[in-house]
Amino acid sequence: MNKLQLLGVVFAKVNECSLELSCVRYCDPNLLLTKRKEFLHNAFVCKYLCDSLLSELQHFSCTNGLTACKHLAIILENLCEHFYVINKALCSFEIHKDHQQYYRTLFDVDQCSLHDPIKISFVNKQDLEITLTDFNEIERFLCKLNLIFPLIDARSGMRIISQIYDRLRKFTGISPLARLEFYKSACGGCYLCYEELQMTPNNGSSVQKRLNGVLCEHVTYTKDLVFQENEYLEVLREDLKRDNLLREDMRTELDDMKKILSNKKERGFYVPEAEQLLHRYDVFTDDIPNYIYTLSDLTYWSKTSEKIIKTMNMTMQQLNVYNNNMIKLKRSISRALNDIEVRDCFDVFEKVVDKRHCMFLGSMFTSSAKIISLLATQCLTAFEEKAVFERLNECDALCSTVNTILERLKSASGDGKEGITKQDFQADELIKGYNVSDEVSVRKKTYLNKVADKGYSKIVASLSTEERSIKKLIDINFLGTLCIDMMVKLEKMFYKRSQIGQMVENGVHLLALCNYDNHLYIRNNLSRQSISTENVNGVIQHILSFLCGPIFTHRHDIFPMPPNIDMAYACDNANVLPHRKEELMQCVNDITSVHGWSISSYNTFFKIDSVDLNTAHAHVWGYVKEFIVAVTLYNELYGQRLRAFRVDENTIRECGLYLTYNSDIPLVLKTDKNVIYGSDIYSILYAHMHHA
């Protein structure tokens, strides 16, 4: 078994323990005290794993960018922390026997340390504090870091990543489910939502408009969970019977709950005779009578109505009665098993939330799909309770019409074609005269039916449209690994930059090999050159590939995209203003004249002054452009094959010139003989020509 397989095994076991501990927090502490020995055993095992693996996991995620290592480190730290908190709360409960205080301690109800600001220090001597309150804000913040990463010193970047790690760890907790306060249902999407939208035509809409209201399934994601109440009650009955715990009162309660679940309010019925008649006709039948088309239409609408009714068949009263009965049954079972009345977290805080709010918070005994069905039923009920629709029932009218057609078909001779037309099945009994009062009555009822039909169709359409958002709000949301993955990519980049000092420890400083005259020699020669026309687009794309952060790397895919796509994605997700995008492209495209690309003086490459953030970022664009253009012209002029690398994407093993994005050591030249480092692009090119 290799290390990755071993990591997977440990991860699975730790996840299992984490899930069980997250459930233990809701249990009655009296029951937990009876299993104190097993609880402490698991706590010591987790402490041992944390002490043995944590530092290695952290180091491995820094050097290799493996998300699973960072995720496992988060869970291990949280497990040890929660074991300690639960054990401390148990010790206090043994003395005071206070259920409320026990649960308040476990869930940090009385204190909050989750919203401390994150401090950012830029290389232009500017500081910033940002407060992150949920996973979505962390994702947006990491997208901004991805864009302006050259403006953050490597060590400062590692400190920022450490703060984000602590914040993510606290938000994640030990449960695989996301807490409601730490994610937004409709957040405007994440960077993966943005990429998915780029695969479809925009139809002239802006990115922000298309992302508005998008339900993100990456930061947190929902799963279709099946919970069949009737089957659950049957399994519960069999378990109790097997353990000889099925008393008469429990049997009665189980039967009552099954009756509640099966007691559905039927609205109308469906006529099976119509289906039998329609079954005789297929695509090869010639001369299908008009009344068959009418019957088919009416049967379709009748079945549609019936389908809606069957789906939305639970009332608020049924839900409350069912929940109350389940609570009674739970207490009966707990008394039978433990000889005491168990008071878990839901019992202690039962009266904190009223019945109406329970519909939105859900229930431990009812599936979220049932809650969503109840919401839909409430919408339709509210619509039908309006006075104008009190006497209108779409399903009854449809079924009545279907029955009328069938009766006329039975009374008709032969196959029913004699004298039967489509008009016979319209509401002709309403129009028996042509006096004004009857005409008004007919028109009024026709109008009301039309309004009712439109009202029903609009409500059903609205429910279908909002189905995903309702599910996202009420369903169980699992934590995704998106934020951890983004953090690991940025951490790997900052870590590699922070190791430059050790990598060049035995190298040669540029000032020991070259002087100002060497700088002028290369600079003057390159200033007389210009990039050939056929290479201009390639150089521009090369510049953009050095400006992109580590999160968007489609240029390295199996079927790679050009670097300008990565840059566009980075700018859009960092919410860069349009005029700044234009300034970026103007800077990158200005490479044909020496005045457009040569900006650094002697030994000042990648030195950024104390200016505002936008100006400092523009300086970074200029330095990266100068780096790429200078290497390109140097190769063309002197016939060299010097390659340019990013230090975060390549280790300093291959021969070439590396850009580190660090102000103290921005350039590292790796040759067959030695390593040369310094802060002057032209002098280091001279060193390559004479000392490589």
From Swiss-Prot:
Q: Does the keyword Cell inner membrane apply?
A: no
Q: Which GO terms describe its cellular component?
A: host cell nucleus
Highest taxon above the source species: Viruses
- Give the molecular function GO annotations: ATP binding; zinc ion binding
Quaternary context: Associates with TRM2 and TRM3 to form the tripartite terminase complex. Interacts with portal protein.
What functional role does this protein have?
Component of the molecular motor that translocates viral genomic DNA in empty capsid during DNA packaging. Forms a tripartite terminase complex together with TRM2 and TRM3 in the host cytoplasm. Once the complex reaches the host nucleus, it interacts with the capsid portal vertex. This portal forms a ring in which genomic DNA is translocated into the capsid. TRM1 carries an endonuclease activity that plays an important role for the cleavage of concatemeric viral DNA into unit length genomes.
Entry similarity comment: Belongs to the herpesviridae TRM1 protein family.
Q: What is this protein called?
A: Tripartite terminase subunit 1
**Organism name:** Elephantid herpesvirus 1 (isolate Asian elephant/Berlin/Kiba/1998) (EIHV-1)
Gene assigned in the entry: TRM1
